[in-house]
Amino acid sequence: MHFETVIGLEVHVELKTDSKMFSPSPAHFGAEPNSNTNVIDLAYPGVLPVVNRRAVDWAMRASMALNMDIATNSKFDRKNYFYPDNPKAYQISQFDQPIGENGYIDIEVDGETKRIGITRLHMEEDAGKSTHKDGYSLVDLNRQGTPLIEIVSEPDIRSPKEAYAYLEKLRSIIQYTGVSDCKMEEGSLRCDANISLRPYGQKEFGTKTELKNLNSFNYVKKGLEYEEKRQEEELLNGGEIGQETRRFDESTGKTILMRVKEGSDDYRYFLEPDIVPLYVDEDWKARVRETIPELPDERKAKYVNDLGLPEYDAHVLTLTKEMSDFFEGAIDHGADVKLTSNWLMGGVNEYLNKNQVELKDTQLTPENLAGMIKLIEDGTMSSKIAKKVFPELAENGGDAKQIMEDKGLVQISDEATLLKFVTDALDNNPQSIEDYKNGKGKAMGFLVGQIMKASKGQANPQKVNSLLKQELDNR
């Protein structure tokens, strides 16, 4: 028997407002524990929540960017549960009347475009954070009350690979809107995954399992891959899948049972009596719609149609707004479009991954990268020299040409000097001359490599090729 995988994702996104969802406390990451709190966050008796207008605006902006319908009437509800980092013993959320519904995003997997539906986007407040030690627990309520949006996909995802692509696209869109930085390492984007299997051709869904502790997109993919195999083996052996919540163990790559999954009835949702229902008129919707910036799909189309970039380049460059803005800044400073794309996808990305930093953490600017690329383009700097100059540029900034001169890496363009390298290479490799004359194209490349090696990468490659061809034809 063959099974079809059905996946739905619930993504929590922290809105980067200055204050919290229902209180004036700061909503900033990294503060001293319990320093960003007040009487509302601590649930003192008699205090009343006040809705953060900007958080509502940003929830609407995100909904619109995800092609959702904005509800004219929505409301807040109490989600009741007991936990030490939830001082009210309930969380203010939206149960049956969310701010956004019926959206979608398009993803690309293996060259195919697929539309993934989005059921809803609702607003809620975050809980605090518990840290468990040996024999005791610590509670930090700085995060309590931070504005969140929860984005719930339709069960349209059919593989872990599609789930990864969905998350990548969703993060990209939200980052472009400016409502969140979507940093998983800081908790501003968190994902829970629901997965079930059913025999191919069956319409009814199987029993779903919820996965938690998915701290990166890669862990989401790995957790789903493991759970897919686990459920398939269980079903093929005649077993049943229980409705469970399981935790992904990063060290083993397996999922571990946490608890039997609760249903919505367990939370005893009811209307939040201290907050009036939201009424969003058409004027309010129109004002928010005007704030939506250029989104990744629009930029991608512009890069392909107007700048002539390949689809792949355009896709990679628009994955993050930071990279896309940097690319546009560099070409605005006169850098060649394709060379800039190659450097950002190649040398720049390699440097960022190796050092585990983002562009903003380096001394790179669109201007100084463009300066280096223009030197490559006009032949002043070879690609080999650029690879030696680039790390210095990224770490300390400055001017690429000055770095090249300070390091003694100035490209050799003097013909007499280059001719000496060329004749030495030919004298030392007579077999390559014979190979060239016999039509073996690789011989030319080998000789160029020998010349570049002898000149420590400083020979002007264009002039080397020209002189080498002349000398070969004369022998």
Swiss-Prot record:
Keyword match Protein biosynthesis: yes
One Pfam family matching this protein: GatB_Yqey
GO molecular function, one term: ATP binding
EC number: 6.3.5.-
UniProt xrefs under InterPro entries: Asn/Gln-tRNA_amidoTrfase_suB/E (IPR017959), Asn/Gln-tRNA_Trfase_suB/E_cat (IPR006075), Asn/Gln_amidotransferase (IPR018027), Asn/Gln_tRNA_amidoTrase-B-like (IPR003789), GatB (IPR004413), GatB_C_1 (IPR042114), GatB_Yqey_C_2 (IPR023168), Gln-tRNA_amidoTrfase_suB_CS (IPR017958)
Quaternary assembly: Heterotrimer of A, B and C subunits.
Family the UniProt entry places it in: Belongs to the GatB/GatE family. GatB subfamily.
PANTHER family: GLUTAMYL-TRNA GLN AMIDOTRANSFERASE SUBUNIT B MITOCHONDRIAL AND PROKARYOTIC PET112-RELATED, GLUTAMYL-TRNA(GLN) AMIDOTRANSFERASE SUBUNIT B, MITOCHONDRIAL
Protein name: Aspartyl/glutamyl-tRNA(Asn/Gln) amidotransferase subunit B
Organism: Staphylococcus sp
Organism lineage: Bacteria, Bacillati, Bacillota, Bacilli, Bacillales
